[in-house]
């Protein structure tokens, strides 16, 4: 059995390495030496977790309890721990300082099991139990092990890479060749449990992708639409007959029904069932299929009667975000009514529908989803006529919606999980008004505010994702569009992610260094007018290419439904600039 010390030492080594290839090589070498559950457990631990994203894997133990556990483990006062924490800024480093050198005895399996026990402790006295379980394992840990146990417990591992590096490492470790990484990535879009994926690859090698299929209770990654520059481009990209569906300003959702159990998952694969009890109840009443997986959008919405006329009222995305609160669910259920608009069906009564064409899936969707006051199908039109398409777009905008998504009806119009596909094309109101695009950007720094903004940020340094290198490259500074409430909420979010220096996966030029560095965690939506060359930014910069920057950026909203690795990519902004 592999000692946890080997994993902790690799964590420490990986923190210092910046080379993509070297990180993948180290990971592959490590996974190649694991057996059984060690493979699955380690896959989770490298991402600072103890399970897949769609499970609630938070351990329910914050700084205060961790401080108490460290004090108990090392026989010092809580005040001493707090004092050291104030100086070091990292409770993992405090554990390292206080721990005594001892023989390494803990295995990966033991540590993982203990972390699961901490998570599962509940009910009366659960805080004391969690503290005791953590304190006990710290007493058995070496200084290096203690440091990383604490960071994992607090969700602050910060190795500076995401799951893409792991997928490449799995390809080398379990198939002997990096060329299988593309297939493994496709498999991960369907089997979104990184531990299950790793273990199956370890057992079956290059043949493993054939073992993965969609199943209720495990969300797949969402298929996404490409953007186009004009209706003419839309017509060129999807020739002949096409469907155009209304595009809503809401939250993407996957609904999974298996018998009496119904779950809702976000685009980030998080379980959001508890936040939407009204959606769950309506699905139970409206859908009779025994097992079904549906793709749709939750929208802040109400049907009103005015002068004996039924009127649909769509409310802003900000209203909907009130429903993401984990507390006072019933209060906000009344305050913010919602509806779900389904536009796809991915699984039905034991059969995956991912390889069915869009027309086949839509027919099944219409057959098995009965609309109610809360459950709806997306309104659509099917046409070959560009004028009819423009008329439909104008109708959606008049209703206060974002725009349309045009969908191919061809024989290859399958559901491409996890892919931004040319089979779906989006055209939004902002494009028609001359604004180039909205971007989902990652906040990586902030600059001190002045005047009314004193004590807050004056501007945010934002980055795009370089998919190949899995790093964040600066693209713009955003200083307009914020309300006082926005600024207050952003300050609160960023305070949990401030770091003393730029994370190794954030690339910033000297002239753009912010006053405060932020680890990649918070995503905001930004509207801009033009992408230009910029020697000051690093987005898309290469040996023969200057960086790219967004002109006249304006903050629109916080994207709670986006993870950093869901952000706008370098390739996307380059394609936009070049008009591809």
Swiss-Prot record:
<feature type="binding site">
    <location>
        <position position="252"/>
    </location>
    <ligand>
        <name>ATP</name>
    </ligand>
</feature>
<feature type="binding site">
    <location>
        <position position="297"/>
    </location>
    <ligand>
        <name>ATP</name>
    </ligand>
</feature>
<dbReference type="InterPro" id="IPR050191">
    <property type="entry name" value="ATP-dep_DNA_ligase"/>
</dbReference>
<comment type="function">
    <text>DNA ligase that seals nicks in double-stranded DNA during DNA replication, DNA recombination and DNA repair.</text>
</comment>
<dbReference type="InterPro" id="IPR000977">
    <property type="entry name" value="DNA_ligase_ATP-dep"/>
</dbReference>
<dbReference type="Pfam" id="PF01068">
    <property type="entry name" value="DNA_ligase_A_M"/>
</dbReference>
<dbReference type="GO" id="GO:0006273">
    <property type="term" value="P:lagging strand elongation"/>
</dbReference>
<feature type="binding site">
    <location>
        <position position="245"/>
    </location>
    <ligand>
        <name>ATP</name>
    </ligand>
</feature>
<keyword id="KW-0234">DNA repair</keyword>
<keyword id="KW-0227">DNA damage</keyword>
<feature type="binding site">
    <location>
        <position position="420"/>
    </location>
    <ligand>
        <name>ATP</name>
    </ligand>
</feature>
<feature type="binding site">
    <location>
        <position position="267"/>
    </location>
    <ligand>
        <name>ATP</name>
    </ligand>
</feature>
<dbReference type="InterPro" id="IPR012310">
    <property type="entry name" value="DNA_ligase_ATP-dep_cent"/>
</dbReference>
<keyword id="KW-0233">DNA recombination</keyword>
<dbReference type="InterPro" id="IPR012340">
    <property type="entry name" value="NA-bd_OB-fold"/>
</dbReference>
<keyword id="KW-0460">Magnesium</keyword>
<protein>
    <recommendedName>
        <fullName>DNA ligase 1</fullName>
        <ecNumber>6.5.1.1</ecNumber>
    </recommendedName>
</protein>
<dbReference type="InterPro" id="IPR022865">
    <property type="entry name" value="DNA_ligae_ATP-dep_bac/arc"/>
</dbReference>
<dbReference type="GO" id="GO:0003677">
    <property type="term" value="F:DNA binding"/>
</dbReference>
<feature type="binding site">
    <location>
        <position position="426"/>
    </location>
    <ligand>
        <name>ATP</name>
    </ligand>
</feature>
<dbReference type="GO" id="GO:0071897">
    <property type="term" value="P:DNA biosynthetic process"/>
</dbReference>
<dbReference type="GO" id="GO:0046872">
    <property type="term" value="F:metal ion binding"/>
</dbReference>
<comment type="similarity">
    <text>Belongs to the ATP-dependent DNA ligase family.</text>
</comment>
<keyword id="KW-0131">Cell cycle</keyword>
<feature type="binding site">
    <location>
        <position position="343"/>
    </location>
    <ligand>
        <name>ATP</name>
    </ligand>
</feature>
<dbReference type="Pfam" id="PF04675">
    <property type="entry name" value="DNA_ligase_A_N"/>
</dbReference>
<dbReference type="GO" id="GO:0003910">
    <property type="term" value="F:DNA ligase (ATP) activity"/>
</dbReference>
<dbReference type="InterPro" id="IPR012309">
    <property type="entry name" value="DNA_ligase_ATP-dep_C"/>
</dbReference>
<keyword id="KW-0436">Ligase</keyword>
<feature type="active site" description="N6-AMP-lysine intermediate">
    <location>
        <position position="247"/>
    </location>
</feature>
<keyword id="KW-0235">DNA replication</keyword>
<dbReference type="InterPro" id="IPR012308">
    <property type="entry name" value="DNA_ligase_ATP-dep_N"/>
</dbReference>
<dbReference type="InterPro" id="IPR036599">
    <property type="entry name" value="DNA_ligase_N_sf"/>
</dbReference>
<dbReference type="GO" id="GO:0051301">
    <property type="term" value="P:cell division"/>
</dbReference>
<dbReference type="GO" id="GO:0005524">
    <property type="term" value="F:ATP binding"/>
</dbReference>
<dbReference type="Pfam" id="PF04679">
    <property type="entry name" value="DNA_ligase_A_C"/>
</dbReference>
<keyword id="KW-0067">ATP-binding</keyword>
<keyword id="KW-0547">Nucleotide-binding</keyword>
<keyword id="KW-0479">Metal-binding</keyword>
<dbReference type="GO" id="GO:0006310">
    <property type="term" value="P:DNA recombination"/>
</dbReference>
<keyword id="KW-0132">Cell division</keyword>
<dbReference type="InterPro" id="IPR016059">
    <property type="entry name" value="DNA_ligase_ATP-dep_CS"/>
</dbReference>
């Amino acid at each position: 059995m592999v000692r946890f010390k080997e994993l902790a030492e690799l964590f420490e080594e990986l923190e210092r390495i910046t080379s993509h290839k070297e990180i993948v090589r180290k990971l592959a070498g490590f996974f190649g030496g694991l057996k059984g559950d060690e493979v699955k457990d380690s896959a989770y631990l490298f991402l600072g977790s103890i399970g897949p994203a769609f499970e609630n894997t938070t351990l329910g133990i914050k700084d205060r309890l961790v401080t108490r556990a460290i004090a108990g483990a090392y026989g010092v006062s809580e005040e001493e721990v707090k004092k050291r924490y104030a100086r070091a800024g990292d409770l993992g480093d405090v554990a390292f300082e206080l721990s005594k050198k001892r023989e390494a005895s803990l295995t990966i399996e033991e540590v993982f099991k203990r972390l699961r026990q901490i998570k599962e402790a509940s009910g009366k006295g659960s805080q004391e139990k969690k503290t005791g379980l953590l304190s006990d394992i710290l007493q058995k840990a070496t200084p290096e092990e203690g440091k990383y146990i604490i960071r994992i417990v607090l969700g602050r591992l910060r190795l500076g890479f995401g799951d893409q590096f792991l997928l490449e490492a799995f390809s080398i470790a379990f198939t002997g060749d990096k060329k299988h990484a593309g297939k493994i990535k496709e498999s991960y879009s369907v089997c979104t449990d990184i531990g299950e994926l790793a273990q199956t690859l370890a057992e079956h090698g290059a043949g493993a992708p054939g073992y993965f299929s969609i199943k209720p209770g495990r969300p797949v990654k969402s298929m996404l639409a490409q953007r186009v520059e004009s209706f003419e481009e839309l017509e060129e990209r999807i020739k002949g007959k096409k469907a155009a569906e209304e595009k809503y300003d809401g939250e993407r959702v996957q609904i999974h029904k298996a018998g009496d159990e119904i779950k809702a998952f976000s685009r980030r694969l998080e379980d959001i069932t508890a936040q939407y009890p009204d959606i769950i109840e309506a699905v139970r009443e409206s859908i009779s299929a025994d097992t079904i997986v549906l793709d749709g959008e939750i929208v802040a919405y109400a049907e009103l009667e005015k002068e004996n006329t039924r009127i649909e009222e769509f409310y802003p995305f900000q209203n909907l975000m009130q429903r993401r609160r984990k507390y006072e669910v019933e209060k906000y259920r009344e305050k913010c009514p919602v509806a779900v608009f389904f536009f796809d069906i991915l699984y039905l009564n034991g059969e995956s529908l991912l390889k069915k064409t869009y027309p086949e899936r839509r027919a099944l969707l219409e057959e098995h989803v009965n609309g109610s006051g809360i459950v709806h199908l997306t309104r659509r039109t099917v046409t070959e006529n560009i004028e009819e398409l423009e008329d439909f777009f104008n109708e959606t905008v008049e209703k206060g919606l974002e725009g349309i998504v045009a969908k191919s009806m061809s024989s290859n119009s399958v559901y491409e999980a996890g892919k931004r596909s040319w089979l779906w094309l989006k055209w939004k109101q902002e494009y028609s008004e001359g604004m180039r695009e909205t971007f989902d950007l990652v906040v990586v720094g902030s600059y001190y505010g002045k005047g009314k903004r004193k004590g807050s940020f004056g501007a945010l340094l934002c980055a795009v994702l370089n998919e190949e290198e899995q790093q964040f490259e600066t693209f713009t500074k955003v200083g307009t569009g914020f309300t006082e409430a926005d600024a207050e909420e952003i300050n609160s979010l960023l305070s949990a992610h401030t770091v003393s220096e730029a994370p190794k996966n954030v690339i910033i030029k000297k002239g753009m260094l912010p006053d405060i560095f932020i680890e990649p965690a918070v995503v905001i939506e930004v509207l801009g007018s033009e992408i230009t060359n910029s020697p000051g930014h690093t987005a898309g910069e290469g040996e023969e290419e200057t960086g790219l920057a967004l002109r006249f950026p304006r903050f629109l909203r916080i994207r709670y439904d986006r993870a950093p690795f869901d952000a706008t990519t370098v390739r996307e902004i380059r394609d936009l600039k070049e008009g591809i």
